[in-house]
């Protein structure tokens, strides 16, 4: 278990209680016990946090994120502590795909993939990128 992940998870849970006390999630009982991939829309900066807090897992959930975020001060450091899998979106990043497959098959982790590949306005329809589907069928 990752100390930083759990510390941040609990701090966010407490913050969420005060910031948005009515937080209702349905369907937690349908999340499989083993490894799986969650595909989500990315409509805002807090989206990944909301999703992680909504899931019933206490175990760290692996996230795929664009490679450029690794260079953002502090954010990149936090993401590395959370074992984020960074993806070069401009190429077929075989190493990132292999990390995802290993996380699912060997470590039995759950993964969170923002299938549109970027943040999008809720009113704007964006086609899903390829990549998340490749990991899912491998």
What are these regions (language model features)?
Residues 1-24:
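N-terminal membrane-anchoring alpha-helices
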């Amino acid at each position: 278990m990752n100390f930083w992940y759990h510390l941040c998870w609990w701090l966010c849970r407490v913050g969420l209680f005060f910031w948005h006390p009515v937080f209702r999630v349905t369907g937690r009982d349908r999340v499989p016990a083993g490894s799986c991939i969650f595909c989500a829309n990315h409509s805002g900066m807090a989206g990944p946090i909301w999703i992680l807090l909504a899931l019933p897992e206490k175990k760290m959930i692996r996230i795929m994120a664009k490679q450029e975020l690794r260079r953002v001060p502090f954010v990149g450091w936090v993401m590395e502590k959370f074992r984020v899998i960074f993806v070069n979106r401009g190429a077929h990043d075989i190493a990132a795909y292999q990390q995802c497959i290993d996380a699912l098959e060997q470590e039995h982790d759950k993964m969170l993939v923002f299938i549109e590949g970027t943040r999008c306005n809720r009113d704007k329809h964006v086609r899903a990128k390829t990549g998340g589907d490749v990991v899912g069928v491998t």
